[in-house]
């Protein structure tokens, strides 16, 4: 499956939370942190992907959509997932969009409002963010104000020499 900047085929962060919730084979729904969230399986292209969505408690729009448990052969904008290190993957993203912001646990692609969570130095989860994120740190990342972040944790992608 080739995932894109705009989201999961058939889903968008501009969809209503209720519509997204209806399309999942729900494993867990909750109101953990004062906002609603749901996690469930989404059948796509003959596979069952684990997908989560959180709701913005102020606007009731989708805050984020997350896709876990990627499969061999999955790609993002044509870039192979699971076959390269986080640094190499960030380099490929930089070729087709904004310069990623790196941290130990993730790759943030600010202009595209996408992040990739990293497990054992390999991108393993894709997360698309809505227009009004609720977490201040995420707001800062997507505003492009990296100087306001802890520079011991975050840094702009730079090609290895």
What are these regions (language model features)?
Residues 1-44, 62-161:
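Non-cytosolic coordination micro-motifs
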């Amino acid at each position: 499956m080739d995932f894109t900047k705009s989201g999961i085929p058939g889903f968008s962060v501009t969809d209503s939370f209720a519509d997204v919730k209806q399309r999942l084979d729900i494993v867990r729904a909750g109101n953990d942190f004062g906002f609603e969230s749901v996690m469930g399986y989404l059948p796509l292209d003959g596979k069952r992907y684990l997908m989560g969505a959180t709701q913005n408690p102020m606007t009731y729009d989708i805050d984020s959509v997350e896709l876990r448990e990627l499969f061999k052969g999955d790609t993002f904008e044509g870039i192979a997932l699971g076959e390269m290190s986080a640094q190499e993957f960030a380099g490929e993203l930089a070729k087709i969009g904004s310069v990623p912001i790196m941290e130990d646990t993730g790759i943030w692609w600010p202009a595209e409002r996408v992040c990739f969570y990293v497990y054992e130095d390999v991108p393993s989860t894709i997360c698309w963010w809505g227009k009004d994120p609720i977490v201040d740190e995420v707001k800062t990342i997507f505003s492009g104000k990296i100087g306001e972040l802890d520079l011991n944790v975050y840094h702009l992608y730079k090609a290895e020499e």
